[in-house]
Swiss-Prot record:
Belongs to the shikimate dehydrogenase family. This is Shikimate dehydrogenase (NADP(+)). Keywords: Amino-acid biosynthesis, Aromatic amino acid biosynthesis, NADP, Oxidoreductase. NCBIfam families: aroE, PRK00258.2-2. Pfam families: SDH_C, Shikimate_dh_N. It is an enzyme of class 1 (oxidoreductase).
Length: 289
């Protein structure tokens, strides 16, 4: 039951009607028996600055940030973590000492399954990342954190690829990072130990699409991990095609859950978060198996 003492958490975005964050966060809060509630706050870009001030006024203790505010919110925060600085985006904000502090838990979300269920020594391995947008930044940083020897980012727009590479120039990540146009993929696919789709190709409702064809994946090594950040459909065409070539597949649902777990640890100041409850709440909500 929500009372005047209930602590407020939430997600800001535009739109947020379809956000899955309230489903998993409220499931975790209920399981833990805590007096918190997690609410969706639809905030248009023009209202962002006023909204951030209002959230402080009404006593919100923390919130998630989704599209289109992940970059725009940065100048409105008192402090951002080195991780958020490196990625250039914030997805988690906490109230600390009457100030808003931002970080990014997408890296933790991305690498969690690669450090647990699918753990291996990544130090001599090669990562190939499809796409060079915002999601690719968290994946690049995550691959660097895991210790990948080579990180290859593949995109279609030469200018954007160069901008992407240039944005890491002052980071140690630059030594491991290479960017390529799409036509270079034929050389990269046979070398890939991890192949990640960060593009929206294959996302609902375009469920029959894939960033790579079966022909392009034919030289994928057996045992390579194919990882798609998309979680609807589950699995995507990309993952199905990769699995047919002997790949181990990971879908985006796990990243969604794990970035949420990392955010809750920050807000609740505790490490014991019911991951399974969050995962099952999403699977049930989405009507998945």
């Amino acid at each position: 039951m929500i009372t005047g003492k209930t602590k407020l958490l939430g997600v800001i975005g535009h739109p947020v009607e379809h956000s899955l964050s309230p489903v998993m966060h409220n499931a975790a809060i209920a399981q833990l028996g805590l007096d918190y509630v997690y609410l969706p706050f639809p905030i248009a870009p023009d209202n962002l600055e006023a909204a951030i001030a209002l959230l402080a006024t009404i006593g919100v203790v923390g919130f998630s940030v989704t599209i289109p505010h992940k970059q725009a919110i940065i100048p409105l925060l008192s402090e951002i973590s080195p991780v958020a600085q490196a990625i250039g985006a914030v997805n988690t904000v906490t109230r600390q000492n009457n100030q808003w502090v931002g970080t990014n838990t997408d890296i933790e979300g991305f690498i969690a399954p690669l450090q647990t269920t699918y753990k291996r020594d990544w130090s001599q391995q090669i990562a190939v990342i499809l796409g060079n947008g915002g999601a690719a930044r968290a994946v690049v940083a995550g691959c660097y954190q895991l210790g990948f020897a080579e990180i290859h980012v593949v995109g279609r727009n030469v200018q954007r690829l160069e901008e992407f590479r240039h944005s890491w120039e002052n980071s140690p990540i630059a030594e491991n990072l290479q960017v390529h146009t799409w036509d270079y993929l034929a050389k990269l696919i046979p070398q890939a130990n991890l192949l990640v789709n960060t593009t929206p190709i294959g996302m609902y409702p375009q469920v029959d699409e894939s960033p790579l064809s079966a022909e392009e994946l034919v030289n994928l090594q057996t045992g390579t991990i194919a990882y798609d950040l998309i979680y609807i459909p589950k699995p995507t065409q990309f993952l199905q095609k990769a699995q047919q070539q002997g790949a181990i597949i990971i879908d985006g649902l796990e990243m969604l859950v794990q970035q949420g777990v990392a955010a809750l640890k920050i807000w609740l100041q505790q490490d014991d978060i019911p991951v399974d409850v969050m995962r099952q709440a999403l699977i049930k909500h989405l009507g998945l198996k």
